[in-house]
């Protein structure tokens, strides 16, 4: 069963993978991610997670799932950008 807790953990794992690219790309990786999140209207939702290590109670599973899908796209974009 998919729960907000399991989705929250997945967001953390994906962010860890994205953050790992800063070893290669420096701060430009985080700027790339922030810009993409902003363009898709998910920056505030992601910051909610970063600031609290969880999402607010009123955050829906759909919103978190959309964020996860976007983080996968960002990760794919970074892999392509850095040929990894």
Model-assigned labels for residue ranges:
Residues 19-84:
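Acidic, low-complexity, intrinsically disordered interaction modules
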Residues 1-28:
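Short terminal alpha-helical segments
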């Amino acid at each position: 069963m998919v729960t907000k807790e399991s989705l929250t953990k997945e967001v953390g794992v994906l962010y860890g993978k994205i953050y790992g690219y800063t070893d290669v790309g420096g701060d430009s990786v985080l700027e790339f991610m922030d810009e993409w999140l902003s363009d898709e209207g998910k920056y505030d939702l992601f910051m909610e997670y970063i600031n609290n290590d969880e999402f607010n109670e009123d955050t829906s599973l759909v919103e978190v799932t959309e964020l996860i899908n976007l983080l996968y796209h960002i990760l794919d974009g970074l892999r392509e950008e850095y040929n990894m």
